[in-house]
């Protein structure tokens, strides 16, 4: 990137092509906190990918533990809120504490759109710049 303050036209066009893929956005733009309490880029696991491939307007998800489905749904809600116009979503959970935790995942992923990890690669820097631009568009 010659100028990190704005996207060049060709760079912008290349981002437009990848941003049109929801799966790409889910696996490249969003950061979550792992079990060790460290930030890591969200990457769909097998159960999440299977649900994503079969996603429909209404989905029944049987209760299961530790498959990451609530994390996937939280990232999907954030993604759809950012990239679809007039999209509204909400969380209904068993307790306020549980619901607040899920909203916290969304909040963290949004705040971390422009996160640069320690010892970043060129891709990390480019994705952080893209995240900064996305946040700038939302806040404008």
Where are these regions (language model features)?
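Phosphate/NTP-binding elements of NTP-utilizing enzymes
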Residues: 2-140
């Amino acid at each position: 990137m010659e100028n990190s303050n704005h996207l060049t036209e060709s760079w912008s066009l290349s981002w437009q092509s990848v941003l049109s893929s929801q799966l790409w956005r889910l696996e490249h733009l969003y950061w979550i906190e792992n079990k060790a309490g460290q930030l890591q880029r969200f990457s769909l696991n097998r159960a999440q990918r299977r649900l994503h491939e079969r996603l429909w307007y209404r989905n029944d998800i049987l209760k299961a533990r530790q498959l990451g489905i609530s994390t996937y749904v939280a990232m999907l809600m954030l993604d759809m809120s950012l990239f679809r116009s007039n999209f509204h979503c909400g969380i209904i959970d068993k307790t306020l504490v549980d619901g607040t935790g899920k909203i916290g995942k969304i909040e963290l992923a949004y705040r971390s759109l422009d996160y640069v990890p320690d010892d970043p690669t060129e891709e990390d820097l480019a994705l952080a710049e893209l995240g900064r631009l996305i946040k700038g568009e939302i806040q404008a």
